[in-house]
């Protein structure tokens, strides 16, 4: 059972759609060394990650992201979320982004 993920390699991808969606055993994901500026879709990225408790996305470059639909929807255990440096100027869809995030 996966409980923790540490991202240390930066791949050349543009979409993170449903990347961790449905991973209901993960408690934390470390993006400490992650920086990418060509991502355009983060929809459903953490959808239904019901055991995820902390998430630091302060290193994310979101300048080109246009879709954050349901990004954190269903993350009902999320207690700590760092979105410092998040740029949402180009985002066209943030609907349901924080649906069922209670904390």
Residue ranges of predicted features:
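Core hydrophobic positions of leucine-rich repeats
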Residues: 15-23, 40-49, 66-75, 92-101
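Structural signature of tandem-repeat unit edges
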Residues: 3-11, 25-38, 50-66, 77-90, ...
């Amino acid at each position: 059972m996966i409980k923790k993920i540490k991202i240390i390699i930066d791949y050349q991808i543009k979409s993170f759609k449903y990347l961790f969606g449905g991973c209901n055993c993960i408690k934390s994901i470390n993006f400490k060394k992650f920086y990418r500026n060509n991502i355009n879709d983060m929809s459903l990225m953490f959808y239904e990650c019901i055991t995820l408790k902390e998430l630091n996305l302060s290193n994310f470059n979101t300048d080109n992201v246009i879709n954050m639909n349901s990004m954190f929807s269903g993350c009902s255990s999320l207690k700590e979320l760092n979105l410092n440096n998040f740029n949402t100027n180009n985002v066209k869809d943030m609907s349901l982004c924080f649906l069922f995030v209670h904390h």
